[in-house]
Amino acid sequence: VGSGWPFGAEYLAPEEQVQMLYPVTVDVKGGRFTIGRDEVLGMANAQVANPRSNPTKELLFIRLMPKHVAHFTEGVSYDEQAGNDTITVDVPEGEHVLYFFVKLNGYSRVILGAPGASGPVVNHLDGKAVERYLDKFSDAMHFTRGKLKGEIRAAFCDSFELEGNNWTPGMFAEFEKRMGYSLYPFLPYVFQRTGAMGEPVREAYGCSFSPEVTRDVIERVRHDFWHVQMQLFKENFIDVYNAWCHRNGLKSRIQAYGHQLHPIETSMYLDIPECESWIHDGIGRVMEPNQYLSGRGYSMVNKFVSSGAFLANRNIVSCEEQTNVGNIFQTTLEEVKVTGDRSNLSGVNHSVLHGFNYSPRQKDFFGWIQFGTYFNENNTWWPYVRPWMDYKARVSALLQNSVYQADIAILPPLEDLWSIHGMQRDPYPGVTYPAYANDLWEAVQQSGNGCDYVSEKVICQSSVAGGRLRFGSRSYKTLLLMEVESLEPRTAARIADFVAAGGRVIAIGKVPHKGLGFRDAAAKDARVKAIIDRVVTTWPDRFVRVDAPQGDMLGWYRTLQAEYGLTPYAKISDLDRFMMMNYYKSGDRDIYFVVNSSIERSMQTRLEFPAEVAAKQAWVWDAETGVRHMLDMRNGTLELCLTPAEAKFIVFEKDRGGQMLPAPAPRSANPIALNGIWDVRATHHVDKSTREFSLTDLVDLHSLPFPWLQSFAGTIEYTRTVDVEDPAAYHTLDAGLTHNGITELFVNGEPAGVRWYGARTFDVAGKLRKGTNVLTIRVTTVLTNYAKARAADTPTAARWEWAQRLNKELGLRGPVILY
């Protein structure tokens, strides 16, 4: 819907445009102070990333505050002068701050909007403005009649970078109605200057507040104000959007995260919740702790979105996948696979590629590219995309018809985060709280368990019985409180009910001891503390506190798992941060999706399955080929080897009719190392020029003294002969390491397979002949070196030059062995 994001357009009336209350501050000392209103308005410039040049500004409130606030004071109001051309204040002796609260109207514009939808952002807290905006589309498109009727599945809405949309007419009345007290006295305590993408600016300004005022006033009122904004957003955008979609025969598909959206609950209201997975540098190679961007692929919001979807019993978890804002031309198809697999591990089962780059023929070679991986017929690896597409389709079909299993619920400290730091711009939060927040669910799934995030609302609406916390179709035996300090009393009471019914609660690092919000704070604090203290005293074995992890998250969780009997769905003998397992059920099938997301290492582990699962027939389903084989599994255990970037479905079902997985053929007693001279032919992808030379050793081709290689992209064919006395003794060719490319084998001129990820091993059984054989290994490189070389004369290549690593390692490195 619309163009660019967030929603907006040139035709919006002023009262429909995005609004912000922005604080201008001036330090003053004793005596008369005078300032012009125009000067104040001139200082009201929110440093947003996508500003409009001519926002409307209106001075609404003026407040004089002491510079150093040790105890709460409302300050002195000079609102009566807000309409004056000149503002005069008699300042008492000492240091003070004048706060001028300016309403900015239409201050931000649509990001990358096309003509007709590139003007000011619509006020997402104004339901009537949102509805008029949406109706303009449906009035023109006629979704419910004509050619489009029944042809459009869903209306899509991107994530919400609203950049500080904190105001709407009637905000004071809405706040008081919902929170039971007035927001007006707390203006200097709550409203902050907003910078890029809605994040608060880090500069010092205004008053300094004592720790007591920060704790007892600012954090509690801030919590309430964010909740009011969250409620208004749901009522005025999410509910309006849903209703508009359904009136027009459409499903709602939204990336429901950002400031003012609950990262779990908002996805529960949607027909198709969506998240996003990115290709960042290091995918498949690094996975640093407490660094949510480090090699993950999935964004930190994915687990929140998928949890909300599962809680709402949605069978589709959509994902904007393969988003790419830097590594455009150096991304390999192998990295695309790893990113997609990781996306699935975060709960995704419906991938929307970002994006196919369609360009007119008159554009340069690289064409139009905007934030997406280079899925384009001009890419070197485009001819090999189909195998990945088939693989992805099989994975998605299986997961969409299965249910992810989780018996551990994680309550993240969202309320504490919002109180202390404010709501965050997910999926790129300014603050991660606690530091390991996005690593905990990973460790759970890397250790064979399954988990969902839950919210306080979910807990309160859950039933408890038989040691389980039940919400809809979801059921949990264990609740992990992730450094949660604050709860609503009703949430604490429901947690107490869960423990009393036999459930287990593990409080990580901290034990809840206070309530939420400003009104009746002392009473709520006492109530929460009393409930939790009683639970700890009454059931010390079922409500336990453990130290927070320090460093080795996986080791910490393995200890927790063993000590508190967190029975995994399958016991994994050798844990690794790059190996993760998800467990699903489909009817009476038990489905394990096991992924090695390391591009560099194979993984060897032993899986031990529960007796009731192991009693069924075990199968391995190969999503790359669609082939299924039965497994000969003994004593409920399976020795599993995953080559780099490999994923397997291990499926248990009652059907025992099928072929057994063939045992690996024994290695030849006399393997042949293909050392010596290789004849090399390099064909440029763009101009089709060829170069030929010979190598005595397989090396990174950039180490050779050939200037043309510095800008090369295309295919490199390595050819040599090998004499084979007994062809039946050899069944595999291992091509070793390929630098950043796709590997293809030809034996005596006949195709013998393509390896676009993982181990470069080829089945050559029956393909060799006695005597001399001609082997050709074709490597298809990425575009990065060519793109770097074209930056001087091609705008698209120049735009992404900053992210391309010049002289990316190139070619076949081997060793090449026939066995």
Predicted regions and their residues:
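Carbohydrate-binding surfaces of carbohydrate-active enzymes
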Residues: V1, M20, R32, A140-A154, ...
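Aromatic-lined ligand-binding clefts that engage carbohydrates, nucleic acids, or primary amines
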Residues: P610, V722-N748, R755, L775-V779
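Short, hydrophobic/aromatic-enriched beta-strand segments in well-ordered soluble domains
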Residues: L98-K103, F649-D655, Y718-R720, V774-T781
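Aromatic-rich membrane-interfacial microdomains
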Residues: P751-F762
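Mature N-terminal, pre-catalytic/accessory segment of carbohydrate-active enzymes
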Residues: V1-I152, Y819
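Exposed aromatic-hydrophobic patches
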Residues: T637-L640, T761-G766
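Exposed beta-strand face motif in extracellular beta-rich ectodomains
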Residues: K648, H731, G771-N773
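An acidic-aromatic loop/edge-strand motif
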Residues: G2-R63, K67-F72, R545-V546, M553-E563, ...
